[in-house]
C-alpha cells in the first residue's frame, strides 16, 4: 500500500509535477479576493430576517435529507424513516413543522426527471405556504462520473479526473453548464460540486477520481471553469472539501482522516484550487471532516475548527460566501464530540449551513435536538444572535442570487427540452472521447481490427462488462461475458480462466484493484489475482481500469492498459472506440502512478499517455 511516510516528501513533489509555487497566506492579494456580495444589506432580505423568530433563523441553517420521491406522499418504509427522523411523514410536513433552509437529494429520491421536478415543486409550494415564504435550497451531489444521483435519461458528464485527462477547460465548463441547466430544470438549485481536492495519494479511499488530479495548477483551472459553467446553468456551485481532502488513507465517512502536510506543503498543494475559486467569487465552499495539525493542532476536524474556517478561510483568504459542512452523519465529524454539540461548534468555527444531521444509535433523528441546541446556545450566550444573523443573511442572499425569491419552480412542461437532449448527450460523448488514456501498449495489441475474433470480457461490474461486451460485439467480435465483481474469489477466477483458454483476446475490467486490504469495506486482492491468472493463460490481455488509474501498479507485467476514470456509458463507448482504433487515445494522466509499495518510484508520470 501507499501508507508509509518513507520518501513521502519526494513523492509529493513528484505527484504534483509542474505545480507552481504559491505565496504564503500573508501574500494573498486582498484586491483580488472575494468582496462582500453587496456593499450594504438588501432591504427585502433584512425585512425577512427581522421577521424571523430565533427558531426560524436556526432552522434556516439546516439542509436535511428526507425519504421518499414526493413532497406530499411516501411509501410506508419512507414514512417510517421520516417519522424516526422528524416525527412527520413527508417533506411538506417537515417544511411545515420546522421551516428548514433546504433539502439534499440522494439517489433514493430520484426515479426520473419528471418525478424529481414534481418533488422539487412540491417542496417549494410547501415553503411558499409558510408565513415567511422563504424558498428552499434544493441541493444534490452531481459531480459527474462515479458520483451522479440523477441517472439517465439525464446527461452523464465525465467525472473530474476524466475531464482533467482531456485537459480541456472548455469541456469542463460546458459539461458543468449542461449539468447545471438540467438540474435547474428539475428544481435543483445547488450542486455540491466541483471537487477542489488535489489527489496526491493513490490510496485515497474517498476522493480518487472525484479529484481533477495531483497538479494544483490543473485542478485550479478545471475548478474555475466548472464554477462558471454551473453558474451559467443556473445552480450554485460548491467547491469542496476545504482545506483539502486529497492526501488521506482514511474515509471520513467511517473514520477521522489526518492530513500530515506541513504548512508549506498545504500552501503549495491543497490551497491553490480554493484560492482560485475564491478569486472567482465562488458562492459556496464545503468543509472537510479532516484533522490538519499544521493548520490547527487542537485535533478538531476542519468543520469544527475556528483557526481553519475563520482564521484562514474568512480572515486570511477573505472569503465572504456561504460555508456548508460536509454531511454531519459522517464519522469524521462525530468522533470527538456528541451529535447535539456539533452544530453549535460548527457555527462557532465559522460555518453557515449544517448539512444532513444524523440519526442516533437507535435510529432516531438528532435534528430536533440539534435545532434546539442552537437556539439554546443563543439564549445562554454561547452564541450571539448576531452571529446567527450573519449566517442566515448569507443563506438568504444566496437564494436571492439564484433567483429563488423570484421563481423557485421547475417548469414541468419543458423538462424534455432541457434534460438529456441530443445536443447535451453529444457534448458529453465528445468530451468523453477526449479522456480515454492509453497507458501501456507494449505488445502492440492495439488497435484491434474489426472482425470475428473471440473476446472474453471479464472483471468488475454486471452492467459494465455487459455494456463493454456489447460495444465490442458491434465491431464484429464474438463476445463472452464473465462478471467477477469487486472481490472475486478463487471459484470466480477459475471460471474466468477456463473461459479465457479458447479466446483470441481477454478484456479485463478493474475497479480499484489497488485496494487489496482483506478487511471489511475493502476489495481485497481478488482483482489483482484475476488479472495475473488471466495473464498466465498466455492469451493476450487488455486491462481497462474504469475508476482509479493506479491499478496497473498491482500487475505491472500487463502489456496493454487503458484508463477511463469512470464507467458511464459514454466512457465505455470511448474505450471501445480506442480499442478498435476508431479514436486516437487523447487522454493524458492527470496524476502520477507510483510503484506498489514504493511511492518514491513513479511508473507512469503525470501527463503520460500514448497515441496511435
Write out the residue ranges for each language-model feature:
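Solvent-exposed loop/turn segments at secondary-structure junctions
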Residues: 67-71, 108-112, 142-147, 190, ...
Amino acid at each position: 500500500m501507499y501508507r508509509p511516510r518513507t520518501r513521502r516528501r519526494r513523492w509529493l513533489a513528484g505527484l504534483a509535477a509542474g505545480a507552481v509555487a504559491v505565496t504564503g497566506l500573508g501574500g494573498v492579494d486582498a484586491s483580488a479576493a472575494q468582496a462582500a456580495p453587496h456593499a450594504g444589506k438588501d432591504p427585502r432580505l433584512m425585512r425577512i430576517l427581522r421577521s424571523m423568530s430565533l427558531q426560524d433563523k436556526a432552522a434556516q441553517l439546516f439542509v436535511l435529507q428526507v425519504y421518499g420521491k414526493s413532497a406530499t406522499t411516501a411509501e410506508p418504509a419512507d414514512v417510517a424513516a421520516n417519522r424516526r427522523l422528524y416525527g412527520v411523514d413527508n417533506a411538506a410536513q417537515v417544511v411545515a413543522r420546522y421551516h428548514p433552509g433546504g433539502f439534499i437529494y440522494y439517489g433514493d429520491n430520484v426515479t426520473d426527471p419528471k418525478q424529481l421536478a414534481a418533488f422539487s415543486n412540491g417542496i417549494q409550494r410547501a415553503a411558499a405556504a409558510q408565513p415567511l415564504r422563504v424558498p428552499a435550497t434544493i441541493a444534490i451531489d452531481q459531480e459527474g462520473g462515479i458520483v451522479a444521483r440523477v441517472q439517465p435519461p439525464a446527461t452523464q458528464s465525465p467525472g473530474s479526473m476524466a475531464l482533467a485527462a482531456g485537459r480541456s477547460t472548455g469541456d469542463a465548463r460546458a459539461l458543468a453548464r449542461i449539468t447545471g441547466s438540467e438540474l435547474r430544470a428539475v428544481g435543483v438549485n445547488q450542486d455540491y460540486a466541483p471537487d477542489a481536492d488535489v489527489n496526491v495519494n493513490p490510496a485515497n479511499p474517498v476522493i480518487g477520481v472525484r479529484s481533477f488530479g495531483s497538479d494544483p495548477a490543473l485542478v485550479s483551472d478545471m475548478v474555475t471553469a466548472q464554477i462558471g459553467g454551473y453558474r451559467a446553468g443556473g445552480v450554485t456551485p460548491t467547491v469542496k472539501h476545504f482545506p483539502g481532502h486529497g492526501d488521506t488513507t482514511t474515509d471520513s465517512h467511517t473514520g477521522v482522516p489526518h492530513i500530515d502536510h506541513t504548512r508549506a506543503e498545504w500552501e503549495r498543494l491543497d490551497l491553490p484550487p480554493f484560492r482560485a475559486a475564491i478569486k472567482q467569487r465562488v458562492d459556496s465552499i464545503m468543509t472537510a471532516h479532516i484533522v490538519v495539525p499544521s493548520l490547527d493542532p487542537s485535533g478538531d476536524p476542519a468543520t469544527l475548527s475556528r483557526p481553519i474556517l475563520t482564521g484562514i478561510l474568512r480572515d486570511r483568504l477573505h472569503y465572504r460566501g456561504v460555508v456548508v459542512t460536509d454531511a454531519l452523519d459522517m464519522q469524521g465529524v462525530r468522533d470527538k464530540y456528541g451529535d447535539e454539540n456539533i452544530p453549535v461548534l460548527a457555527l462557532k468555527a465559522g460555518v453557515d449551513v449544517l448539512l444532513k444531521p444524523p440519526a442516533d444509535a437507535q435510529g432516531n433523528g438528532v435534528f430536533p435536538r440539534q435545532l434546539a441546541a442552537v437556539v439554546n446556545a443563543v439564549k445562554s450566550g454561547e452564541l450571539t444572535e448576531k452571529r446567527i444573523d450573519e449566517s442566515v443573511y448569507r443563506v438568504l442572499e444566496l437564494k436571492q442570487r439564484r433567483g429563488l425569491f423570484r421563481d423557485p419552480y421547475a417548469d414541468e412542461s419543458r423538462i424534455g427540452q432541457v434534460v438529456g437532449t441530443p445536443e447535451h448527450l453529444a457534448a458529453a460523448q465528445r468530451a468523453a472521447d477526449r479522456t480515454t488514456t492509453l497507458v501501456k501498449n507494449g505488445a502492440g495489441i492495439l488497435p484491434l481490427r474489426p472482425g470475428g475474433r473471440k473476446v472474453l470480457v471479464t472483471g468488475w461490474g454486471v452492467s459494465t462488462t455487459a455494456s463493454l461486451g456489447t460495444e465490442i460485439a458491434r465491431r464484429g467480435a464474438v463476445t463472452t461475458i464473465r462478471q467477477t465483481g469487486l472481490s472475486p474469489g478463487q471459484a470466480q477466477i477459475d471460471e474466468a480462466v477456463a473461459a479465457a483458454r479458447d479466446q483470441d483476446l481477454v478484456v479485463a475490467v478493474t475497479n480499484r484493484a489497488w485496494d487489496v486490504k482483506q478487511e471489511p469495506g475493502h476489495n481485497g486482492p481478488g482483482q489483482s489475482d484475476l488479472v495475473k491468472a488471466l495473464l498466465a493463460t498466455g492469451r493476450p490481455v487488455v486491462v481497462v481500469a474504469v475508476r482509479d488509474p493506479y491499478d496497473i501498479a498491482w500487475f505491472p507485467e500487463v502489456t496493454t492498459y487503458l484508463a477511463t476514470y469512470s464507467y458511464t456509458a459514454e466512457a465505455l463507448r470511448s474505450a471501445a472506440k480506442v480499442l478498435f482504433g476508431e479514436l486516437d487515445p487523447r487522454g493524458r494522466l492527470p496524476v502520477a502512478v507510483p510503484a506498489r509499495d514504493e511511492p518514491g518510484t513513479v511508473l507512469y508520470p503525470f501527463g503520460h499517455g500514448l497515441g496511435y
